[in-house]
Amino acid sequence: MPSTLVDFITEVDLTAVRCITFIENKTNYDEYVMSEKQPEELVVYHGGFLSPRKRKLIALISRRAAETTQIRFWADIDTGGFRMFNRLQELIPSLTPMRMSGECVDLFHEHGLERSEEYLTSLQEDMEAGKYPLFQDAIERILYHGVTIEQESFLNK
């Protein structure tokens, strides 16, 4: 759907939806929709950047979701993914991370993206400052292995 059509959406019916999943990476989104999407699940391609129109659509979806609807977000396990999560959580306070745990870092570290000492030091400082509390276990594992995990790593499992 072209983003210009968002301005014309006035109502969203989510009565049959029990889970909303936002996925940052297009390839992972496509694969997830084809192989894992559940009947009562709405899967939304996030795309990494929240334009004003995309923010408007996400806010509408969030307002229409039932209180019991599980809403989750999946992105790279790195600073960019943590930032995207925080921005989306500003719109959806009940948002939870999906496949962004320390366990996932351990599972996929052999395919991880090696990071510089500067990157790792900055990430450690962010963790110590409490910047990404939901990702403390993931950050600890990133620091241990010295790598971050791109979503594409999950396609090779």
Question: Which stretches of residues belong to each language-model region?
Answer:
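Nucleic-acid enzyme cleavage-core boundary/entry regions
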Residues: 1-45, 50-64, 68, 80, ...
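Active-site donor/metal-binding and catalytic loop motifs
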Residues: 100
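Structural alpha-beta junctions
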Residues: 91-97
